[in-house]
């Protein structure tokens, strides 16, 4: 795999999507940001949604509740647009509860064993919300917050900047944490997510986006035929609670191996519970520099998504437990109807000193970037530019 050469340039060609049939009409003259009122919480708080559009016809929608990605509309090789991220229809649907579709999760993405950690000699008790463990920031994590938002736009991108201040002690975490998440849709057909945070006390931070992807289009069926490559030759074995055992194990000779292209479902029957929910250790040569983490191809539509990140790990989740009670446009979702590639630090790092540190101290800045780059795979050739 080839690493990203720079913040705005991909090592692989991106599709000339605006030229495809059905995409040029209505495309913006340049990057644009439009704000809409999306709904209200039961307490009357307004929830807004921002629509980002580039000149090539791609469209991204983000709402302020949970800093949630609600749409990524990408054409297939015939120019037909589809929303490739799983979503719900109304603000009320999200508020009533959902499996974190497209939400920013924090303060700590993934699991912390025993809902506790010790930092600088002080033990902190977090809210247990996964049995006795803590997951995705607790019962009132960032996915249930209405974020402040403002549009950001340049000649090369359309974006929205979302901010939130998490008070000292929220869900048990020390320190007042100031967080900024920026989504930007670029003219190069990249969805760029930037995460920043600062604290006034030592704390742990691990942020990600929990988008579920289906490159055939949300609601179209399962993703087991998607072809996946992960730039990871090791993963973290875990116990039955999905808490890492502490070792970094080779994927070679196991159904965890996606170092070469293979369909997601090709060996899922050999995985415990027939479901991937595992953290992979990315093969990075340059520490936290932006590099390629994953490439996914949906053969029928020709859609390609590449994921670049500064993070050391990525959680692959194949959503076996997705309920058919959850619907979009009246169409029920179901098992394996989406996959997640959650770029992040490792689960339970606060209790594993050998894992990359997630400690953030006053005066330091937490900064990470993840990019999703979209293109079209020609039937007999590389992704078109």
What are the language-model segments listed below?
Residues 26-385:
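An exposed, glycine/acidic-rich loop-and-rim segment of catalytic or binding clefts
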Residues 8-19:
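Bacterial N-terminal signal peptides
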